[in-house]
């Protein structure tokens, strides 16, 4: 869901250099991440992409120095764990349908999921914490 990389990481679609095509869903995923033109060029040319360039293209969320990578990943995991995970799960459900749905169907799904989120204990806790000027304590419910 959230893709991060070490600054030393690189990415390559080298299939074209040996007469093959990208597989394992590469022709499906990469164009959706970075656009058809850029994906076509990377897949046909077989260029190596640095982690920083991958971030700039939208392939990954963040790049961390190698020596702090593990600590930064732990920070992200902790931050997510302390968030309203029920709402995050509903967000993921909506995102999973975005390329399959029409705009109308996606708006209907968002309406259903937003109603579910709005009836959650986490939403009540989040709004109470905001009004009381305190940090929320979410339970994933």
What does each of the following model-derived ranges do?
Residues 73, 102-106:
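Bacterial helix-turn-helix/winged-helix DNA-binding modules and their immediately adjacent linkers
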Residues 1-88, 119-120, 125-128, 134:
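Crotonase-fold acyl-CoA enzyme core
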Residues 42-43, 94-98, 113-118:
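Helix-loop "lid/cap" segments that line or gate small-molecule binding pockets
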Residues 17-19, 98-102:
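Glycine- (often His-adjacent) and acidic-residue-rich active-site loop
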Residues 99, 135-141:
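Short C-terminal tail/terminal secondary-structure segment
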């Amino acid at each position: 869901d959230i893709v991060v990389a070490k600054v030393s990481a690189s990415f390559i679609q080298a299939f074209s250099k040996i007469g093959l095509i990208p597989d394992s869903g590469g022709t499906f995923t990469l164009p959706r991440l970075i656009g058809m033109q850029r994906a076509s060029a990377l897949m046909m040319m077989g260029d190596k992409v640095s982690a920083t360039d991958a971030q700039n293209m939208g392939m990954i969320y963040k790049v961390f120095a190698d020596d702090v990578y593990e600590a930064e990943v732990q920070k992200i995991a902790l931050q997510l764990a302390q968030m309203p995970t029920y709402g995050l799960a509903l967000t993921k459900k909506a995102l999973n349908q975005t390329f399959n749905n029409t705009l109308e169907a996606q708006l209907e799904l968002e309406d259903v999921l937003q109603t579910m989120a709005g009836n959650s204990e986490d939403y009540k806790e989040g709004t109470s914490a905001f009004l009381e000027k305190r940090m929320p304590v979410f339970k994933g419910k």
